[in-house]
A protein has these predicted regions:
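Nucleotide-sugar donor-binding/catalytic module of glycosyltransferases
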Residues: 1-124
Length: 124
């Protein structure tokens, strides 16, 4: 029997309006179901939060949190990670664009292991 694992995607944003739509689309179109998308915004001054709110209207698995003070990248991710409830957590930057089978392939690869780490590289 194939068990569908609960996948949490954790993303931090800060002034990411240029790429946030493409990244959210690439997450939402994954071939493996995404349980929740946790987005922690570090007080963006552009339209990042407005764009995310537009997506939240259509997708109830997107959860937006906005910091009350600017934390910076690392502390912002630490806060966001604490909010994830899935069996597996996929970390995403706001300007990533995922291959449609990214999560499906990762889950197939790590099933059966008690500890797994996956590394991605930038290209282009």
């Amino acid at each position: 029997m194939n068990v569908i694992e609960k996948i949490s995607v954790v993303m931090c944003t800060y002034n990411g309006e240029k790429y946030i739509r493409q990244q959210l689309d690439s997450i939402l179109q994954q071939t493996y179901p995404i349980h929740e998308i946790i987005i922690n915004d570090d007080i963006s001054t552009d339209k990042t939060v407005d764009i995310i709110k537009e997506y939240m209207i259509r997708h109830d698995n997107i959860h937006l949190f906005v910091n009350s003070k600017r934390l910076g990248a690392h502390p912002n991710f630490m806060v966001a990670l604490e909010k994830a409830s899935g069996n597996y957590i996929a970390i995403s930057d706001q300007d990533d664009i995922w291959e449609l089978t990214k999560i499906e392939k990762q889950i197939a690869c790590i099933k059966g292991y008690t500890l797994c780490f996956s590394l991605s590289r930038a290209f282009g």
